[in-house]
Amino acid sequence: MLFRSLVILDTQVPLGQRVEITSDDIDIERGSRSRLKVGGELARNDLLHLALMASENRAAHALGRTFPGGMTVFVDAMNAKARELGMMSTRFVDPTGLSSANVSTASDLVKLVRETHRHALIRQYSTAESHQVNVGGRSIAFRNTNRLVTNDTWDISLSKTGFINEAGRCLVMHAKIQGRPMVIVLLDSWGKLSRIGDANRIRKWLTSSAPPRAAQG
């Protein structure tokens, strides 16, 4: 969703505009769940907040569907932006990231993190601990999918998680470690908490005078 938010902000789509969740936003490819019910309305900035912070796929799809010109124009704009940033191994086919036909590389994602980090709103939304929205008279609270943003020992200024079976559990972050800005890209972690453990091990290795040896086996 980092890339989608970049395109939305670059094109200056009205963030205060109300967007209705429709049946078109239901994930039929993966069957992922959502607490955003069909018929509910949210401001576009709330959808952006939930997509960045909580990986809310229905929110991400609604953002693409209501982009000026529709979904096809949105995806085309994403691919054009990728080429502009020199992300030559990246290709998008949908705005949610749920399709395995969306492809990228670790080096391309470093370029993406550096570019999106320039946007204060993306930094703010992606690292928020929680966000509450009112939909149809009901208050719904969402939490960040990266538990490290609530860890006081980390200084994280941008974060995004992702998961599909083909890619595994992924995490990208822009963080400061001992005062040095770092971009961390973790792809295909095998367990729910392994990307968190991997991030902590990377930080330990960077801050240790005697880097730990790689695990055997």
Functional labels for PLM-detected ranges:
Residues 44, 70-217:
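Penicillin-recognizing serine hydrolase domain
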Residues 1-107, 114-120:
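Active-site-adjacent loops and short helices of periplasmic peptidoglycan-processing enzymes
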